[in-house]
Design a protein with these regions (language model features):
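Acidic, surface-exposed loops and disordered segments
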Residues: 1-183
Length: 183
């Protein structure tokens, strides 16, 4: 069944290694376009995305805002995409829309041969301060991005994670028909 899926879904993997090769402005424009076309409740398009390149003065402070486990590998990426939404009563729908936008970005990145790794670990206050994000906004997730790097540069633990086969749960663990049938 897997062979029926588009290759970007199958090939996308959370990379732990990136090369020094820059993502071009033309590639970033294509990625922005992919985000714009994400599904969105009532076409609100609530996402605010800040791209931070390695050359940016904000790069180091953003990196220092990440959790230790993310800092272990994320220093090699050449671009971060920081997804935010404004806080209000529709926050749940906005988070869902940001998820769609992020998935579009990751799949389009895969098509462009840009590796990605979504992160959920950071210090919210530090990220907001380093990128001047207003307090009434939430950082939903941060995506590390870059061209494919060499796994030979990884330490033993990261190399093991990098080489680990991507697996998925058996269908019965996550899917049922008609009624709840999960343990």
């Amino acid at each position: 069944m897997k062979d029926k899926l588009i290759p970007e879904i199958i090939n996308r993997k959370s990379s732990l290694t990136f090369s020094d090769e820059k993502i071009t402005i033309d590639e970033i424009q294509i990625l922005i376009e992919s985000i714009k076309w994400a599904p969105s409740s009532r076409n609100m398009q609530p996402w605010k995305v800040i791209f931070v390149s390695k050359e940016s003065t904000s790069y180091k402070s953003l990196f220092n805002s990440l959790s230790e486990s993310n800092q272990e590998w994320a220093s090699n990426c050449t671009l971060y995409a920081v997804f935010c939404v404004e806080d209000d009563k529709r926050l749940n729908k906005k988070f869902l829309d940001v998820g769609y936008a992020g998935q579009n970005l990751m799949l389009q990145s895969e098509r462009l041969k840009i590796d990605t790794h979504p992160m959920g670990g950071w210090d919210e206050d530090k990220v907001k301060k380093s990128l001047k994000i207003p307090n009434e906004n939430h950082v939903v997730f941060i995506l590390a991005m870059g061209k494919k790097g060499s796994p030979d540069k990884l330490n033993v633990n990261l190399k093991e994670r990098h080489d680990k086969e991507r697996t998925r749960n058996p269908n019965e663990e996550n899917f049922s028909f008609d009624i709840w049938k999960f343990n």
